[in-house]
Every structure is written in C-alpha cells, then in structure tokens.
Amino acid sequence: FSLDDTVKSMQINTYELIDGEWHIVAGGGGQAFEDAEGRLALGFDNLADGLRIAIQSEHNNGSTSYFKESENDITGMGYATSVLSDKQEIVYDQEIPLVIQIITSKNEVHSYVVDYFFQPEEYEKYDYEYVYAITVLFSQKPVSELAN
C-alpha cells in the first residue's frame, strides 16, 4: 500500500455477519503506523478459527495472530473466499474490505467481490450459516483517537 506522510495509525478488523449486521470479532484497537509505504499479509484457512497478520514497512515489521475456540461448528462445511485483487484508493478513516469469506453447508454459494461488505443484505438473502470479513482502515489520527 502507498500513503502520504500524514498517516498516523492503521486498524485491521475481522467481522462476523449476524442478523444482517457486521459485528467485530477481532481488532478494534489499532496500531501506530507512520510509514508512507508498506505491505500487509493475511494468513488463514477459515476465519472462524482465526487469522495471522504481518505488516512490513520501512520502520515497522511485525506480526500478530488471534486464534479462538470457535463456538461455530463448521465441520463438513465448505467455504468461498473473495479477496481484494485490484489496487484500491485509500481514503483516510474509511474501511477498505480485504476479504469476505462465506462458510456454509449449502451446495450453492453466491460469492461477491469484497465491496459487497457495504451491502450485507446481499449475504442475508441466501441464509448462509457464517459470513466473515476483514477490513483495513488508515487514519491521520493517533491510535488513542480511533473509534473502537
């Protein structure tokens, strides 16, 4: 990703779609980030079980992960994952959807581009058991001023 020198922080959030609304399951805090360029890598099989995040930039290298005992029984379910594949304009303080993952026992899955994060009702139409999303947000505010 490429930013300007006014960036102060970044936030990576994982959501689960519940009753037509996105509910945060991990993230919400943020971290100081003041480099104009960097790389973000995400590692996961299914988002119900967790996520690994790695960030690399001129002054910032690190990784973090969260894994949880899933309350959701996904045994035998299939999943479809959509990822952001094109360059995206970064607008400060606006979430950018990176990944949408549908986990379901249904035989047919309608997968959408990640921009459908902003239209969760599309996923509700098909009554999938689980839908998850990962977003990133860059801000000119320090971490202490980010909304949680």
Region spans (language model):
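Glycine-rich, aromatic-bearing surface loops/beta-hairpins
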Residues: 94-148
